[in-house]
Amino acid sequence: MDRSTSNGFRCIKSFANDTSSAQLKGTISALFRDYRKEKPVDNKTFALYLNQYLYDKKPLESKIERTIDKDLWKIEKVTFDAGYNNERMQAWIYLPKDAKPPFQPIIFFTGSNDIYSKEFDPKRIGSLDFILKSGRAFIFPIYKGTNERHDELNSDLQEETVLYKDHVIMWGKEFSRTVDYLETRSDMQADKIGYLGWSWGGFMGGIIPAIEKRIKAIVLNVGGMEMNRTFPEVDQLNYLPRVTQPILMLNGKHDMFFPVETSQKPMYDLLGTPSNFKKKIVYDAGHLVPRTDFVKETLVWFDQYLGPVK
């Protein structure tokens, strides 16, 4: 125990009729899942789970709501049918000016900060501008529960609630509807779609590509498995073996959110991608890999599996 002069200690005085002390002496159960022992569901059961993400292929009724002209790229805010409850969603489309269409679209799944944000700032993609500089389009969907679509969702952590389950299903549909929209644009190579996930998006990279097979290459920046339990219908454990696309995992050795042995390694091992099409790099870092390496490895991966930009 650290008893330095700057540290104190806390005392408690209990009352005669106080029963809380017994609870304070009770055992605290640690939040932990041993993924070496847990097994994913069989294919027949998973096919039933996959049916949750079906939606009617109604007209997208897409509309460009706003255009922002920057020196090196153009930004479009588009809205279209979300695939459920007659709801509309939005996506920000970033188009490089120094490259010729059609563009390879890289669809981003953001980190948890966007759950707590009330409004998306289209100028904030600074650390991801290398995607545009490589000649690719960068697609930022606004998922249910984030930014302007903020609702009662208050965490990215999976949990055993209908609220969480419903959101995962909505995110899956929204991603697919975003792909549907990209397929309508002549300036997009919709057969060369990349998935880029960051933190929460790295975790969701173990789910979304199992649902949406039009994704052709995946890069996960600090992703892993969570210790929280959730309903099996949306448990990442059951989706990972069905992620079969080429996938690159970039992780930190000191990541406190996704520890190497209990989170990162089980995710990598459970992936259904053949061993020669998946790769994991661990850096001497925490929940953020060095930017230079992130940029280099991401572009090399997309060049290899989507093809170099011409």
Task: Give residue ranges: language-model regions.
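Catalytic histidine neighborhood in serine/cysteine hydrolases
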Residues: 268-289
